[in-house]
Amino acid sequence: MNRNNQNEYEVIDAPHCGCPADDVVKYPLTDDPNAGLQNMNYKEYLQTYGGDYTDPLINPNLSVSGKDVIQVGINIVGRLLSFFGFPFSSQWVTVYTYLLNSLWPDDENSVWDAFMERVEELIDQKISEAVKGRALDDLTGLQYNYNLYVEALDEWLNRPNGARASLVSQRFNILDSLFTQFMPSFGSGPGSQNYATILLPVYAQAANLHLLLLKDADIYGARWGLNQTQIDQFHSRQQSLTQTYTNHCVTAYNDGLAELRGTTAESWFKYNQYRREMTLTAMDLVALFPYYNLRQYPDGTNPQLTREVYTDPIAFDPLEQPTTQLCRSWYINPAFRNHLNFSVLENSLIRPPHLFERLSNLQILVNYQTNGSAWRGSRVRYHYLHSSIIQEKSYGLLSDPVGANINVQNNDIYQIISQVSNFASPVGSSYSVWDTNFYLSSGQVSGISGYTQQGIPAVCLQQRNSTDELPSLNPEGDIIRNYSHRLSHITQYRFQATQSGSPSTVSANLPTCVWTHRDVDLDNTITANQITQLPLVKAYELSSGATVVKGPGFTGGDVIRRTNTGGFGAIRVSVTGPLTQRYRIRFRYASTIDFDFFVTRGGTTINNFRFTRTMNRGQESRYESYRTVEFTTPFNFTQSQDIIRTSIQGLSGNGEVYLDRIEIIPVNPAREAEEDLEAAKKAARQNLFTRTRDGLQVNVTDYQVDQAANLVSCLSDEQYGHDKKMLLEAVRAAKRLSRERNLLQDPDFNTINSTEENGWKASNGVTISEGGPFFKGRALQLASARENYPTYIYQKVDASVLKPYTRYRLDGFVKSSQDLEIDLIHYHKVHLVKNVPDNLVSDTYSDGSCSGMNRCEEQQMVNAQLETEHHHPMDCCEAAQTHEFSSYINTGDLNASVDQGIWVVLKVRTTDGYATLGNLELVEVGPLSGESLEREQRDNAKWNAELGRKRAEIDRVYLAAKQAINHLFVDYQDQQLNPEIGLAEINEASNLVESISGVYSDTLLQIPGINYEIYTELSDRLQQASYLYTSRNAVQNGDFNSGLDSWNTTTDASVQQDGNMHFLVLSHWDAQVSQQLRVNPNCKYVLRVTARKVGGGDGYVTIRDGAHHQETLTFNACDYDVNGTYVNDNSYITEEVVFYPETKHMWVEVSESEGSFYIDSIEFIETQE
């Protein structure tokens, strides 16, 4: 359309009226955009710019049939495929108009009604009138409001100003809200979900309209006045709804298949019809949902629908069944009941998944009869894309002569018209195919002919036309220009048998045509101006060990699976752009296991990276099971015909890897530089700071600040020098704010195990690494534990810097770890375990700098990996594998009587564990409120009550232990031991001290508990008593804590242990233990022995000096204690005797007469007169 001698491509947003264009901004374009539209076939028809082709292809004055809704489904998909090949622009307004006119051709709901009626017919089930009425009413509301939105959008695009922008934004929001409200009426809500299968085409078409709408927020949102946060929210909703809508459609589709799966030929016929028609009206559309992601496909792309559809077998099937037994549809003929069933037809006519094929040659084998040539066999020759190897499949009777030899070569067979019959008589029934014409895109018509109508009633004859089931894109125009599918294969099932108990015979020949979408690019063309889709099934070669398997329903075709190390296949591509053009590779996969992915071009590895699993083994594939990831290292092709191979290595166990497609993305340095600048601005300004720019957003982590700094550092100095300078100032300010709010001391790990009270305390095995590709600052490395000695590092955040009833968050980044335990301890503990795979392996190479790494490309790759973690729904096990982590803990009332800080503990307790992590920070999130505050107050009150109870108990134990220790000394300074006490009293006091609980943290023994101070006080005094006791005892190792050191023994003597108690055991009458002592002659000594005798006989402890003076303490089982109480075999008693040695050398000897003798301690101490 021209106005004032101006072409539309010269003026963006040119108004369509004749009024002055005062508010139109003119932009000169370097290239005529029409140049890219030359030499187009049916897409030229679809892409025409005027309004001529926004009208429906269904006559609104006629009723809408089942074939019509198939026509609508094919046309909508074809229209979208055409427009996906161009950048998103105002041209999409014509798509809106086309879709609305196609779905509401008469401004009524006849098409939507026909969608439901067709599925009702296929599955033989009726939808509730109430559900149907509600759905149609809601569709009417959507139509009205969609028209209002498109009208406002078109007016704003042609005459942009603030008022029109406000109006279109308002109508956008209203329409989005209505879709959110009405979508449950189409099969996902509680009132309609029982009819989800019947409503599947309705749901898919409505979902498509909603996702198509949401993409406009990315295209126009900023010009409407939306801020970036609002635009991002719409984008996130678009992605989330893509997942929701896709999963619903796949479930409804599969439920319908399961419901139709039966045992008879008729059930198979309906099953195949449902499979084909739901593919054309719903599932093809679902496969296009991801391509509305403007951020992923900014320059357009070429979606490839590689799926196959099977038209009905070419056999007699009248629209109305006769009342007689003659001339009935083949699948309900009772004579075939014993020969045709569901499984026979499915296994004979439907091929297993395979690589995408192109038909090369077709031979029809015929039997010449009086009626003409009957089709009885087929030879199908085909090849994989860009393969010179011809494959061949044969079906039916192969001994018959060739009636037609059709060389397809580089043409398409787009239509097949056949004459079919059911010759029925008392002697048998036969279904035959006679005249058949194959229409080629070259204009040639080939086939078998010569049929004469002899002996067959007209009612038993029928013409079958493939376009009745696969309509062309424009039924009013030439099919040769507008066909939608091309023939890719013909399967066939033929049988002939004699009926049981009858001389009559039955026979049938059932050729079945297999079709692929015409839009599939048969050359795998790589262009320099848009993203190229390469489904892996378009390979010319399948690697050994790789298997083509049925797709999950939303990929538009089958996928390739691999369960071990090796390749997937090889794709030959045709490069049309200059060989200097650089590209990047993106691919879509699902996996139950971690793996290394390799891409080679012409034998040279261009990318490799380690990727993580996306689902659990045995789990059903859903939309979220498939992940799209991108390599950052660019490459270029070296020849116009090149080969891309993909393979996997380094599988972490048994599992499955599914590969859907790879995408070839042209690198546009200028645009990517602009995108880098916008990403840096977003990271440095919008994502870090609060609105007032005086603080960091609460959810921002120190790691994110560092990564924002990396993004800014990677900006070009030449192009964006000023922007870079300002953004660097911003991220430096953000880093300072990050440090100021961090409650951890020394977050850079400059000093460990310092003498300061707080700060980092660590065990052996903790090292600090400097720099590296994953951390801008220092990082911690924790080695594996040694037997019972964990590797740990911890720090206490003092209570003085904390606030009561406030939430705090520990953030960090883990490069990789195994069995890393992260604990936050306050009055309660928050425990986190991280098992993070070492999958951040770069596919980049050195940039020649002294650091030896290209941090810019490195960061892009890391960000791509982290992006999958952020958007992939995870269970608790998967969350433990994420690199970034945050752990939250709430404070209570900060009871002043307890030293309530927050302990941050990192440890590895296993011998095969390890960890590398950094960017640790403990930050205040904010005060608790509402239910969180009430819950914390209740928990804190319970803890305080329990603390009071424990303290009362500990106070009782503390008082008893303190009194027992006081009794050990004769002075207040604990410098002199009470001469009356012995080891038994010390052990008794020790047992009381050890009964104090809460001395150390359960997490790490190096962390003191709430009773650590009183325990330390008593332990120090007890240690003093033990020292004084050992010092005064002339007997060395008299408590046997060092085994038999210092003692002379026979073989029948040993030292045993019971808890903290060691005791000497003599278990035979000839056992003997002795020790020589040095003493002060003529001084008073006391020999004190604590022991017990078991069994008969006596036990003896004898002391003697060099003058042959001696004293003996005797123990037996009949001993009484000092109070006259009987002592049993399990009780120890203490005996003592005074001795005045006359020489400085003495000897102590231990022996027994029979039984066993247990000695707890032997003392020989000097006492005051």
Curated annotation (Swiss-Prot):
BP term (GO), one: symbiont-mediated killing of host cell
A GO molecular-function annotation: toxin activity
One Pfam entry name: Cry1Ac_dom-VII
SS bond list: none
Highest taxon listed in the record's lineage: Bacteria
The keyword Repeat belongs to this UniProt entry's keyword annotation: no
InterPro entries per the UniProt record, alphabetical: Cry1Ac-like_dom-VII (IPR048645), Cry_V (IPR041587), Galactose-bd-like_sf (IPR008979), Pest_crys (IPR038979), Pest_crys_dom-III (IPR005638), Pest_crys_dom_I (IPR005639), Pest_crys_N_sf (IPR036716), Pest_cryst_cen_dom_sf (IPR036399)
UniProt KW keywords: Sporulation, Toxin, Virulence
Keyword Transcription: no
Function: Promotes colloidosmotic lysis by binding to the midgut epithelial cells of insects.
Family: Belongs to the delta endotoxin family.
Any further remark recorded for this protein: Toxic segment of the protein is located in the N-terminus.
UniProt name for this protein: Pesticidal crystal protein Cry9Da
Gene responsible for this protein: cry9Da
